């Protein structure tokens, strides 16, 4: 049961999970063989009235790991030149140390148990983060749940009937510049705002805290 005194906390709202928005840009679709080239991480906070907001942010350009396959079509899509010195790229290890440090601080501050990735088509971002974690031997320090995610594509499909990030943002009243898409930082910012909008709308509509009276018995089985 939810403690009615503490319902307006991240801990209560997400069953002890600490939601963290992640967006990655890569050199292909295979997390094992393609490079993680850019990652943005955004933590969230809940105010005293239970409304979800963006909190802290980290953004890194990443050096491709040795032997990574760099697919030209992927690089054309995200407009990344892996060899450009202007990227000021860091290693996967350097980026993950800072990301995990920020997330661990947030977990402790919010009295949560574990972080959970929030992403648009979350299985993709989750797979690349986990692969990088294995490559850098950071598994023990990894604060994220090994398989559970919050997918804003699925949530937007439920709420708006739209699964594309730009379309979901449009329906949510969030300005989305398609010319800035496929930047990890830009997409993470929009995903974070979208997730907050969805969570806050559900609360505003009376869905949180949950009341069994909102549905009738076996409502999903009615023909």
Curated annotation (Swiss-Prot):
Positions of Mg(2+) 2 binding: 23, 25, 182, 187
UniProt GO MF annotations: 3'-5' exonuclease activity; magnesium ion binding; nucleic acid binding; RNA exonuclease activity, producing 5'-phosphomonoesters
Active site (UniProt): 182
EC number: 3.1.13.-
Gene Ontology annotations for the cellular component aspect, listed alphabetically: cytosol
Matches recorded under InterPro entries: Exonuclease_RNaseT/DNA_pol3, RNase_T, RNaseH-like_sf, RNaseH_sf
The UniProt record lists the keyword Nuclease: yes
Superkingdom of source: Bacteria
Residues given in the record as Mg(2+) 1 binding sites: 23
Cofactor remark from the record: Binds two Mg(2+) per subunit. The active form of the enzyme binds two Mg(2+) ions in its active site. The first Mg(2+) forms only one salt bridge with the protein.
CC cofactor: Mg(2+)
GO annotation terms (biological process): DNA replication proofreading; tRNA processing
Residues under site feature: Important for substrate binding and specificity: 124, 147
Keyword annotations of the record: Exonuclease, Hydrolase, Magnesium, Metal-binding, Nuclease, tRNA processing
Domain Exonuclease: 20-195
Enzyme class: hydrolase
Family from the record: Belongs to the RNase T family.
HAMAP family: RNase_T (MF_00157)
Subunit structure: Homodimer.
NCBIfam families: RNaseT
General function of this protein: Trims short 3' overhangs of a variety of RNA species, leaving a one or two nucleotide 3' overhang. Responsible for the end-turnover of tRNA: specifically removes the terminal AMP residue from uncharged tRNA (tRNA-C-C-A). Also appears to be involved in tRNA biosynthesis.
Record protein name field: Ribonuclease T
Organism: Blochmanniella floridana
Gene: rnt
């Amino acid at each position: 049961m939810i403690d009615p005194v503490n319902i307006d906390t991240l801990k209560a709202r997400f069953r002890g999970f600490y939601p963290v928005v992640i967006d990655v840009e890569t050199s292909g679709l295979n997390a094992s063989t393609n490079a993680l080239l850019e990652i943005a991480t955004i933590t969230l906070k809940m105010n005293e009235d239970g409304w979800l907001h963006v909190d802290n942010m980290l953004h890194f350009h990443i050096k491709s790991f040795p032997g990574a396959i760099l697919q030209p079509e992927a690089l054309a899509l995200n407009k990344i030149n892996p060899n450009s010195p202007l990227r000021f790229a860091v290693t996967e290890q350097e980026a993950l140390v800072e990301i995990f440090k920020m997330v661990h601080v947030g977990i402790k501050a919010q009295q949560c148990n574990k972080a959970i990735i929030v992403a648009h088509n979350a299985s993709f971002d989750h797979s690349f983060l986990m692969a990088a974690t294995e490559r850098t031997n950071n598994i023990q320090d990894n604060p994220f749940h090994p398989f559970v995610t919050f997918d804003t594509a699925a949530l937007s499909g439920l709420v708006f009937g739209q699964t594309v990030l730009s379309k979901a943002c449009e329906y949510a009243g969030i300005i989305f510049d398609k010319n800035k898409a496929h930047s990890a930082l830009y997409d993470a910012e929009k995903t974070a705002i979208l997730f907050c909008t969805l969570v806050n709308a559900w609360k505003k509509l009376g869905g949180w805290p949950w009341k069994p009276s909102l549905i009738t018995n076996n409502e999903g089985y009615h023909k």
